[in-house]
Regions:
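Alpha/beta-hydrolase fold nucleophile elbow
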Residues: 157-167
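Sec-dependent signal peptide cleavage junction
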Residues: 21-33
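Lipolytic serine-hydrolase domain surface
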Residues: 32-70, 81-158, 180-195, 201-293
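The conserved beta1-alpha1 loop
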Residues: 77-83, 167
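Short, hydrophobic alpha-helix immediately C-terminal to the catalytic nucleophile
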Residues: 175-179
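Alpha/beta-hydrolase fold active-site loops
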Residues: 73-74
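Gly/Ala-rich beta-loop-alpha elbow adjacent to hydrolase catalytic centers
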Residues: 166-170, 174
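N-terminal secretory signal peptides and thylakoid transit peptides that target proteins
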Residues: 1-16
């Protein structure tokens, strides 16, 4: 996929103000100091793109290095997961809190770079699967938008490292972005995502293996070091994948037994640290994650 950086950057300048105004309306602007990339309200409840947005458009809160401000030596983008319980405003606020938690945990564990949050429409859909199908669709569609972020950032800050960290369904945003970047301007110019870190990934467990060649090739070609942190007792992933996917999740079992993962892909069995706490990866593993950076 090719990316038109100039066309998008012109649009970004006018959307930043709108996101900042939204933050002010929610009462969190003064206290919230984490740089944010947002695609909130870019998708309808059925997962279709709203009028006025494109496959690669995104907004910021005016604090994102390389896009709104100067470059940083090391940039980590954190992508949150699914929200099946909250109202629209509640889902956005919960996402902001998770992003802030990620920033605090990673920096507290010694990460010296800048953590940026990526927030997306994780609360779309409804029905017997609680909107899981629509949320998956939107997560995968967000891959091109996150890829555009990486293109825009590296075009301005070519010497900086870029890393992606995801939780739960955020893994499908992350992996989709790698597929978008593979064979694009990004890799054609020799750029890479320096490391990726999947936490409790709500993603089929064959994804990083040769059984899924598009994702296998994307990990191999785009990423320097790819890590997956999983817990065999993660009961949220067990419920989702037993109920809706009839499969097993990468964040529960690790990659599918007997398959061949990408050569730059590694796993950490976090069962003893995380147990059945799907929300506990950052709290219990930040030291491990930072040591892998």
């Amino acid at each position: 996929m090719s990316f038109n950086r100039r066309t998008f950057l012109k649009r970004s300048a006018v959307t930043t103000t709108g996101l900042a105004a939204l933050a002010g309306a929610s009462g969190t602007a003064a206290a919230y100091d984490v740089p944010l990339i947002s695609t909130r309200d870019h998708y309808n409840d059925d997962g279709s793109l709203v009028s006025g947005e494109t496959q690669r458009s995104y907004d910021t809160n005016g604090l994102v290095p390389g896009i709104d401000t100067g470059c940083t030596g090391d940039l980590t983008v954190f992508i949150h997961g699914w929200d099946k319980n909250s109202s629209e405003s509640g889902a956005e606020q919960a996402a902001r809190e998770k992003i802030q938690h990620a920033r605090d945990e990673l920096t507290g564990a010694g990460y010296g770079g800048t953590v940026v949050g990526y927030t997306w429409d994780n609360d779309v859909g409804s029905g017997v699967d609680f909107g899981w199908g629509e949320a998956k669709t939107v997560a995968q569609k967000n891959g091109a938008k996150l890829a555009q972020v990486a293109v825009d950032y590296k075009s301005q800050c070519p010497e900086s490292n870029v890393r992606f960290v995801s939780h739960s369904l955020g893994a499908q945003v992350l992996l989709s972005s790698l597929r978008s970047l593979n064979g694009s301007w990004f890799t054609d110019n020799g750029y890479d995502v320096y490391s990726t870190h999947l936490l409790g990934a709500a993603q089929d467990n064959e994804a990083p293996t040769q059984e899924n060649p598009d994702t296998y090739d994307a990990i191999t070609n785009v990423v320097t070091n790819a890590y997956n942190y999983h817990s065999n007792e993660d009961d949220v992933l067990q419920w989702i994948y037993n109920s809706f996917e009839f499969d097993q999740a990468l964040g529960e079992t690790g990659y599918e037994e007997g398959k061949t993962p990408a050569p730059n892909y590694d796993e950490f069995d976090a069962t003893s640290q995380v147990g059945n706490d799907h929300s506990g990866y950052l709290t219990n593993l930040s030291d491990e994650i930072v040591s892998d950076m």
